[in-house]
Amino acid sequence: MFVSYKWLEDYVDLKGMDPAVLAEKITRAGIEVEGIEYKGEGIKGVVIGHVLEREQHPNADKLNKCLVDIGAEAPVQIICGAPNVDKGQKVAVATVGAVLPGNFKIKKAKLRGEESNGMICSLQELGIESKLVAKEYAEGIFVFPNDAETGSDALAALQLDDAILELGLTPNRADAMNMLGVAYEVAAILDTEVKLPQTDYPAASEQASDYISVKIEDQEANPLYTAKIIKNVTIAPSPLWMQTKLMNAGIRPHNNVVDITNFVLLEYGQPLHAFDYDRFGSKEVVVRKAAENEMIVTLDDQERKLSADHLVITNGTKAQAVAGVMGGAESEVQEDTKTILLEAAYFNGQKVRKASKDLGLRSESSVRFEKGIDPARVRLAAERAAQLIHLYAGGEVLAGTVEEDHLTIEANNIHVSADKVSSVLGLTISKEELISIYKRLGFTVGEADDLLVVTVPSRRGDITIEEDLIEEAARLYGYDNIPSTLPETAGTTGGLTPYQAKRRKVRRFLEGAGLSQAITYSLTNEKKATAFAIEKSLNTVLALPMSEERSILRHSLVPNLLDSVSYNLARQTDSVALYEVGSVFLTKEEDTKPVETERVAGAVTGLWRKQLWQGEKKPVDFFVVKGIVEGLLDKLNVLDSIEFVQSERKQLHPGRTANILLNGSLIGFIGQVHPSLEKELDIKETYVFELDLHALLAAETAPLVYTAIPKYPSVTRDIALVTDKTVTSGQLESVIKEAGGKLLKEVTVFDVYEGEHMEEGKKSVAFSLQYVNPEQTLTEEEVTKAHSKVLKALEDTYQAVLRG
């Protein structure tokens, strides 16, 4: 943000303070001044001259011989090559002895035999960048208004005796992206008042509502749209003081109407747009989403293709502007414009950013909407622009403002106490001092018991909590005035939060189950970013990644775990069992910050039992990994709320995959990596799982209830069932548990067979059922009765029969 010292003086009494001193005060109050540019530094001897006569140079076709009054005793002759120099003009003259940028000194000279006593200057020759010079003066000299005083200082008239402060604003201080915002900040620092601009003007008798209506179709993207009608305007150059302010702020002047909208943008921070009413093409403004592939030619004469994500301002049929980004060329203000439709609106910053990014079109307006504007200034800015158009374009402002308003500005009341401020800052600050500080900032302060109730104006969107108010108090009190003391805090006993304790329990269980912890990169490539994700998410892409392989924040832990499995297998580690507890990053809407949430994932391959003393060698299969997951869920006391549901996922084996539901909500998955992906990664049969750790640890759990160890012996019955391949073991297990009644204590799957001697489309699933009666010894009749119910239920439900 470039801040003109002289422009700032319009709003705040700076009492002649040196710009460097002011910059130091602003920096010490928390907004860094990155530099000061002294306009016109090193330039001297430039005055306003009056061209009395102009004639063709006798010896050069492209030179002019001019007689110029520079306020001296007699006019001087100056040879000028500018094509636009003419008799009667007021121009900038570098007199003999003057110094221009680059230490260029002006001397008497003879040009093609004619004496020249000075130089008539263009703005570029006075140090102004070409891109900031109005088009009419881009190839020639600058012409002052006729009322400019001959012989007076040209630098002062062009405000080249100004100092420009460059503010390094952090993203939260969007309020300081305009002159009034900076004025409020400086006034608070200097403990003075802000002089607000006047917005009074005489309204015409005609009503604006007779000329235009407003309709908003997307109230979320555009909660407020206002329109004013201004008739009988005369398009001309804007006043010199306005042009110079715009140039010092880095904006090229165009004409009075366009310059006024840009001036108010810089003054209030509120983007405006002026349409040529007659070229707009209708008496209604309709704000809607663009049609897919709808076209518009913007003010930069570029034809742009829009999408349904973009918001447009239309005349009911055709787009006339991309909302918050740039107007359309069709209704552009031109030299013959007579009636203005003035727009002031509040557009959703995320929607504007999306359109700006998609179209590759970044403007002063889009930047401010993206960072957040003050909703309370929308109408004020429109009134200010209407006043200036009345004054400098002769416009008649029709009575009333036509608008559609769905914008609610809620009071931002925050409670804070002097004791809390004193405690945090390590000093003693009274309630009265605190009230004074907040009032200097333009806040309203009330009291409730021992607390201050501070109402923060809507322009300060960065202040939302008590700690923000404490920071404001520190800024205005002065960081240099805070004594160096040790913090005064009560002693606290170290310990883990409940979440941390549960997370540690997860790690301990998985390590106890035989898995080793892995830590992998949070960044991955586009292909892997969305693979294995529990839920869909948009990608969060780094602006300047070190490489394409590490350019996107991950959605799942599994892809990088599989890379680790592949790495270990390639180095002769036959069996790998890894887990990771880490963050994934999910984005629901484009251009919003990703949500960081924790997941736990595992990848297991090879032999689960590989040593002789562990028994017969056993390869990893679905049920081994499912047992690990069930053990973890049981450890967290949520297993009773869990359901495994057969599913299909692109990267997993279609017949060996299950979603994991907690109280009916998806929290993870388990399955074998798809054979094609295993081949691509050059890994053996590998099983993976991933769980939403945050959802698991936040789940409500039933209190643990002590159950005595049974005094009486249990009876175990093993069964092998032949059933359709489409029936999962989980479905069979559910039927067994429901039919087994209170005597059935435990059900365990111990074998699945689909090989030789099985019918086509059939498989064998073997279960071990444990029956026990906690009150007495089971009889054979009781076991047989309960077991028969189980077998009948299996046959009735899934046509599952005992294997012969």
Curated annotation (Swiss-Prot):
Alphabetized InterPro entries for the sequence: aa-tRNA-synth_II/BPL/LPL, B3/B4_tRNA-bd, DNA-bd_dom_put_sf, Fdx_antiC-bd, Fdx_antiC-bd_sf, NA-bd_OB-fold, Phe-tRNA-ligase_IIc_bsu, Phe-tRNA-ligase_IIc_bsu_bact
Required cofactor names: Mg(2+)
Domain tRNA-binding positions: 40-155
Any one GO molecular-function label of the UniProt entry: tRNA binding
FDX-ACB domain sequence ranges: 710-803
EC number(s) per entry: 6.1.1.20
Binding site for Mg(2+): D462, D468, E471, E472
Listed Gene3D superfamilies: 3.30.56.10, Bira Bifunctional Protein, Domain 2 (3.30.930.10), Ferrodoxin-fold anticodon-binding domain (3.30.70.380), Nucleic acid-binding proteins (2.40.50.140), Phenylalanyl-trna Synthetase, Chain B, domain 3 (3.50.40.10)
Family under the similarity heading: Belongs to the phenylalanyl-tRNA synthetase beta subunit family. Type 1 subfamily.
Subunit structure: Tetramer of two alpha and two beta subunits.
PANTHER family: PHENYLALANINE--TRNA LIGASE BETA SUBUNIT (PTHR10947:SF0), PHENYLALANYL-TRNA SYNTHETASE BETA CHAIN AND LEUCINE-RICH REPEAT-CONTAINING PROTEIN 47 (PTHR10947)
Protein name per Swiss-Prot or TrEMBL: Phenylalanine--tRNA ligase beta subunit
Species whose genome carries this gene: Bacillus subtilis (strain 168)
Lineage: Bacteria, Bacillati, Bacillota, Bacilli, Bacillales
